[in-house]
Regions:
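Residues that scaffold, gate, or flank divalent-cation-dependent active/transport sites
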Residues: 1-110, 115-117, 122-132, 136, ...
Length: 147
């Protein structure tokens, strides 16, 4: 899309697939950040970091299995409220790129970036700013644009 069409609606979808994990791991001290970390829901692993995967822990393992595989595993119960609060904070952050930001819980932001292309010198530069900002905040996202 070129800058001459900068008033068109152009939706950017940001999916945060690791949000249940990252709402906890961003706050870990460096010594704990390298340990296996799992997120549990009804005593089952629903999310895990690379260290947990490397030890042999897998999605859907029960809590006892995870602890038997690694005694160093750090576990957290899934916290949907914390995830929604984090998604809301990410939406507030995204307002610097567009006044049209929509939350699609549990893990998606929609941003109308059509009117922002000229301000940010085109789609490539805008996406670079958004992606580096998300990375700087400590999150991982997958982006898609509806053209």
């Amino acid at each position: 899309m070129n800058a001459s069409n900068n008033n068109s609606i152009l939706w950017l979808c940001l999916h945060f697939p690791h949000l249940p994990l990252q709402v906890f791991t961003r706050g870990l001290n460096p010594a704990d950040a390298i340990k296996p970390v799992v997120i549990l829901e009804r005593r089952r692993v629903i999310a895990l970091n690379q260290a947990a995967f490397d030890t042999g822990i897998r999605h859907n393992n029960n809590m006892d299995t995870a602890y038997s595989i690694s005694h160093e595993v750090i576990s957290f119960d899934k916290d949907s409220d914390k995830e929604l609060t984090t998604l809301t904070n990410l939406a507030q952050w995204a307002y610097q790129f567009s006044p049209a930001v929509t939350i699609r819980a549990p893990d998606v932001l929609l941003i109308d970036i059509g009117g922002s292309l000229k301000l940010f010198n085109g789609l490539k530069a805008l996406m670079a700013s958004i992606e580096s900002g998300i990375n700087d905040l400590g999150y991982t996202s997958i982006s898609a644009i509806n053209t």
